[in-house]
Amino acid sequence: MQLVIVAVGHKMPGWIETGFNEYAKRMPPELRIELREVKPETRSSSNNAATVMQREAARIDAVLGSLSRQCRIVALDERGRDFTTVQLAGQLTDWQREGGDVAFLIGGADGLDPALKARAQTLLRLSSLTLPHGMVRVLLAEQLYRAWSVTQNHPYHRA
C-alpha cells in the first residue's frame, strides 16, 4: 500500500523538505509515503478563486489518473472530520485491510475545488488552526508515521 500526498505548491523551504523526508523514510517499505507536487495557479484579475481551484483540480486529476483505480481519496479540508491519533491508526489499518493506495489531497492558497472534495471518500481536518501549506505536508507525514507506530505498538507514540 502506498500513501500518496498530492500537494499544490512547489519550491518549499529546505526545512519543509527535510521534515517531510524524515517521516517518509521512517515508514516501512510496505507503507511508503510519496509526495507529488502540483504547480499552483496564480490568482489575478482574470483568475478568480474559483478559476484557480478548477485549474489546480485539473492538475490534481492528472496525478490521480496515474494512480490505481482502487485508490482512496482523502481531501484535507478545514470542515473535515477530526481524527484522534488512535482513530487515524484504526483508519490506516482499515485502509490496509481493504487494499489499494490512499491519496491525500492538499489544496493551494484558495483550497480544493468543491468537485474534488465531493469525489473524496473522506474529508480530513488536521487542525482548527490555519496552517502553512508546506507545514501541512510535514504534519501529515508525521501523523501518518505516528498512526503506523500505534498499530505496531512502537514506542514513538506514548499517549
Curated annotation (Swiss-Prot):
Pfam family, one: SPOUT_MTase
Domain of life, source organism: Bacteria
Keywords recorded for this protein, A-Z: Cytoplasm, Methyltransferase, rRNA processing, S-adenosyl-L-methionine, Transferase
Catalysed reactions, semicolon-separated: pseudouridine(1915) in 23S rRNA + S-adenosyl-L-methionine = N(3)-methylpseudouridine(1915) in 23S rRNA + S-adenosyl-L-homocysteine + H(+)
Compartments in which it is found: Cytoplasm
GO molecular function ontology, one term from the record: rRNA (pseudouridine-N3-)-methyltransferase activity
Signal peptide: none
Residues that, per the record, bind S-adenosyl-L-methionine: 76, 107, 126-131
Top-tier EC class: transferase
This enzyme's EC code(s): 2.1.1.177
Main location class: cytoplasm
Family matches, as InterPro entries: Alpha/beta_knot_MTases, RlmH-like, tRNA_m1G_MTases_N
Gene Ontology CC annotations of this record: cytoplasm
Quaternary data: Homodimer.
Stored NCBIfam families: PRK00103.1-4, tRNA_RlmH_YbeA
PANTHER family (alphabetical): METHYLTRANSFERASE, RIBOSOMAL RNA LARGE SUBUNIT METHYLTRANSFERASE H
Family statement: Belongs to the RNA methyltransferase RlmH family.
Function (record text): Specifically methylates the pseudouridine at position 1915 (m3Psi1915) in 23S rRNA.
HAMAP family (UniProt xref): 23SrRNA_methyltr_H (MF_00658)
Official protein name in the record: Ribosomal RNA large subunit methyltransferase H
Record gene name: rlmH
